[in-house]
Amino acid sequence: ELKGQDVGGEAGGDRAEPTRFKGPAVETISFEADLDATDQLEFPDQHAATVAHGLAPQIALLESLSQPSSAQLSKVNSQASSGQLEIAPMLAPLLLLVWGASRVIPVELTSVSVTGEACDPVLNPIHAKASFGLRVLTVDDLGFASKGGALFMTYLQNREQLAAKAQPVSLSTLGVTGV
C-alpha cells in the first residue's frame, strides 16, 4: 500500500497546495510465507538441527527481528541502575527485503505472526505460516547519506525506470474527449 504525503490532502493541510508532495510516500508491504521442514526431514543426516528442533530456530529468528536483544535490555537496565541516562533508543539492525536484484528495500518490521500448523512427535514445529507487515524506510527516516537511504533511492529509481517502460494510454482511448 502506498500513501502519498501531499501537502494539502489531509485534514488541516494546506488546501491551496493539493498537488505538492512533502516527501516520499508511506509504503507498507504485507505478505505471508509458508515455512516447511518436510524436505529437510527427508534427509535427517544432512539436517540434524531440523531433526532436533524443527522450524523453531527459524521462527525464533523471525520473532527476534521485532524487539531488542536480551543483551541490549540488560545493558540499558545496568546503565539505569548505575544512574546513567540513555537518551537515544536502542538501535535496531537495518532490515532489507530482497525481492530480486533490483528490489532491495530497507524496511521496518511492523508485525510478524507465526501460526504453527504441524508438529513432530516432540512438538517441534515442522510446518508454519508466517505473516509479515513491513513499512518501507525512506530518506525521511534514514537520511540521504546512510546506506539505507542510498538503498531506498536505488529502489525508487528502479521503480521509476520500470514505470517508464509502461505503455502510455491516451484519454481518447478511455473515451474521454474535449479535455
Predicted regions mapped to residue ranges:
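Acidic, Ser/Thr- and Gly-enriched intrinsically disordered low-complexity segments
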Residues: E1-V179
